[in-house]
Amino acid sequence: MHDDASHSKAASRPDRVNEPEIRPVTIVIGCGDVGSAVAHALHCAGYSVVLIDHADPPWTRRGMAYTDAWYIGAASLAGVDACFCASVRSIPFVLDRRDMIAATTWSWQGVATALQPIAIVDARVVKRQAPAMLKQSGGPLTIGVGPGFVAGLHADVAIETAWGDDLGAVIETGSTKPFAGEPRPIAGAGRERYVYAPRPGRFNTDRAIGECVSARDHIASLDGEPIIAPLKGALRGLSARGARIAVGQKVVEIDPRSDPALCFGLGERPRRIARGVVEALLRRRLLAGSASRGVQRESLHE
């Protein structure tokens, strides 16, 4: 009789073994290589991710980012897909699939109101402007990624983005380092491997990320003005056709190593920054999915 009663109670309990894990929502602002790496890491750690940027984003490292989702509706990065959501109402349907990131042009404030995220990450890495004020009293955890963020002022915590031993460090008191001003050299080439927009306009190109070009090759135009390759190498960065470009904005990056494989996937710097963002959530015990089982925590120190 005792066994029958126990069996009856067990049968009446809901089967929790096959219940899906709860995936708290996170918002990432900026679909460049850093923002995309952050979104990728959060997704792999078990969080639902909404990646936000404005229409026709100008980011150049499209082989290392989800930027193309804003142009063709979908993009893939290191085995994880992003799907563009034209309507804020479609975002929950994409997140419910649990296998992809939702990309949108809706404001982060509007998405936050609708979805009540546990964290908001500004991963635009703005270099020459004051950081955005994300911190909200009683709101979700806010994380500032990039130079000039002051933890406790602009955001709850900040993530260091400058090359060095502190790259990806979680800063809970104080600020990240100021913008250094000069890019890290690759095969001896520094700023000369970039092309910056001489004027505002619409970008047009028939070239592809990873394509190898020679110095002085015509690779694009900006409202009809030719954009010329500054040196020989592979197109690691190239704004998308139709991108809205501001004067002085980076539109082309040449990798002088001429290896197309280096133009795709998660770069070292974005990956380390993304690990820092996940670590910031773990420190606040904002756990989800594999993070709650320690999988992501182990990968933070690889």
Predicted regions and their residues:
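Well-ordered secondary-structure scaffolds
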Residues: 9, 15-302
